Amino acid sequence: AASKGAVSQLARWLATTLAPEVRVNSISPGGVFRNQDPAFVERYSERTPLARMATEDDIAGPVLFLASDLSRYITGHDLVVDGGFSVW
């Protein structure tokens, strides 16, 4: 949690420092499934509103969005991609 907070704050600082030439955002992913112990995956999934861990593709979409011109007016934002885990 501390490292995610540091990355988010760094992105915010860089966004103000490098604007308007460069947009800087960050992504805070939740748990990504990588063949973890089934008991861990089940416990994690029970605590997530979308009832599963992320896949790499779940993270890739937001990365592509932030890298594209579709997000041309977004800077200094930390996009949480955690299936709702953090809303509890």
What is each model feature region?
Residues 8, 26, 45-70, 74, ...:
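C-terminal helical subdomain
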Residues 19-23, 74-76:
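Short, small/polar-rich loop/turn modules that mediate ligand/substrate recognition or access, typified
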Residues 16-20, 32, 54, 67:
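A short hydrophobic alpha-helix cap/turn motif
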Residues 14, 85:
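Active-site segment of SDR-like NAD(P)-dependent oxidoreductases
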Residues 3, 11:
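Active-site helix of classical SDR
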